């Protein structure tokens, strides 16, 4: 059972940086390596985060079976031991999303990230109906992820918020500033707003002015102190420091990430390897970084080694 009401869940996730951990796979057979995953979560918890997305996009939800997803979520719940909320994924079709929600409740998760339906183009009315059915199937607080083929405007979101009191979060992966402005202007503090564009640090400062107080940080996986320092600078509107850190690490990191489609996940696992916390390979259809690219990433990480004190 969740320790948070939907309202409490929303308040908690909006209070700080959100962790987006990768899922560990064994190199021998690509099976879930639960022991390594839990050990890594224990290390991550030594750094302050407001919530944890288990088996999310960076956690390769798209390549996990329902049974594997349940194992990952249960491992996260067990390892966190109530210290921070665990946000479980739901996605694919409506019926499957509902089953994911039921499994998340049974596992003791604290909230749901509702990912877009798989390979389905639908009208906004259809997407809204999907979201409503999923929200009404669970008592947990739900964050709807606006991206790809699941894009809702302020009118649909307002109706959903009226009908579904547990729809308490909005994660933006679209990057349409006009739409984001309209949504926040209409709904205000009815939602907690989460930045969800790839390498969310890039957009964190302008998004903060539109009510987006937090984001899921993939780089928190391997440069957690840098990620937290960056987040603190954003929240303080320390523009000079934010842009210094963008130039020092984030923007060169994005250039490397953009080398190939799918590297948004692969580069995070490469980062783990660079700091000596190998999480295994990515699953197909993703591909791992080349040795040369890993060397480039290692040189980049060394720029912030003083902040990280990686040897400590």
Curated annotation (Swiss-Prot):
- Describe the reaction catalysed, as an equation: 5-dehydro-4-deoxy-D-glucarate + H(+) = 2,5-dioxopentanoate + CO2 + H2O
Q: What class of enzyme is it?
A: lyase
GO biological processes: D-glucarate catabolic process
What metabolic or biological pathway is this protein involved in? Carbohydrate acid metabolism; D-glucarate degradation; 2,5-dioxopentanoate from D-glucarate: step 2/2
Q: Which terms in the Gene Ontology molecular function aspect does this entry carry?
A: 4-hydroxy-tetrahydrodipicolinate synthase activity; 5-dehydro-4-deoxyglucarate dehydratase activity
| Keywords from the UniProt entry | Lyase
Q: Note one Pfam family from the annotation.
A: DHDPS
- The record's EC number reads 4.2.1.41
Against InterPro entries, the record matches this protein to:
Aldolase_TIM (IPR013785), DapA-like (IPR002220), Dehydro-deoxyglucarate_dehyd (IPR017655)
Task: Please report which protein family the annotation says this sequence is part of.
Answer: Belongs to the DapA family.
Please give the name of this protein.
Probable 5-dehydro-4-deoxyglucarate dehydratase
């Amino acid at each position: 059972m969740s320790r948070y009401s939907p309202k409490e869940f929303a308040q908690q996730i909006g209070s700080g940086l959100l962790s987006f951990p990768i899922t560990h796979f064994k190199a021998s057979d690509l099976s879930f390596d639960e022991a390594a995953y839990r050990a890594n979560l224990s290390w991550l918890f030594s750094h302050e985060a407001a919530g944890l997305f288990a088996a999310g996009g960076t956690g390769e939800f798209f390549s996990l079976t329902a049974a594997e997803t349940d194992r990952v979520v249960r491992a996260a719940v067990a390892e966190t031991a109530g210290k921070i909320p665990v946000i479980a994924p739901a996605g694919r079709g409506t019926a499957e999303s509902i089953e994911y929600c039921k499994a998340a409740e049974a596992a003791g998760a604290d909230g749901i990230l509702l990912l877009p339906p798989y390979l389905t183009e639908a009208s906004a009315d259809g997407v809204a109906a999907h979201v409503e059915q999923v929200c009404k199937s669970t008592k947990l607080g739900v964050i709807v992820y606006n991206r790809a083929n699941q894009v809702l405007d302020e009118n649909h979101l307002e109706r959903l918020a009226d009908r579904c009191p547990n729809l308490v979060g909005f994660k933006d992966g679209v990057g349409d500033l006009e739409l984001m402005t309209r949504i926040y202007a209409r709904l205000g503090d009815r939602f907690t707003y989460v930045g969800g564009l790839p390498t969310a640090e890039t957009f964190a400062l302008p998004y903060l002015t539109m009510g987006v107080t937090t984001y899921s940080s993939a780089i928190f996986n391997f440069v957690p102190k840098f990620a937290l320092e960056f987040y603190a600078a954003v929240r303080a509107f320390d523009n000079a420091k934010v842009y210094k850190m963008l130039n020092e690490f984030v923007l060169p990191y994005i250039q490397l990430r953009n080398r190939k489609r799918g590297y948004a996940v692969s580069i995070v696992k490469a980062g783990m390897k660079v700091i000596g916390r190998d999480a295994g390979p990515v699953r197909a259809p993703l591909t791992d970084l080349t040795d040369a690219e890993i060397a480039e990433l290692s040189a980049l990480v060394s720029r912030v080694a003083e902040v990280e004190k990686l040897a400590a």
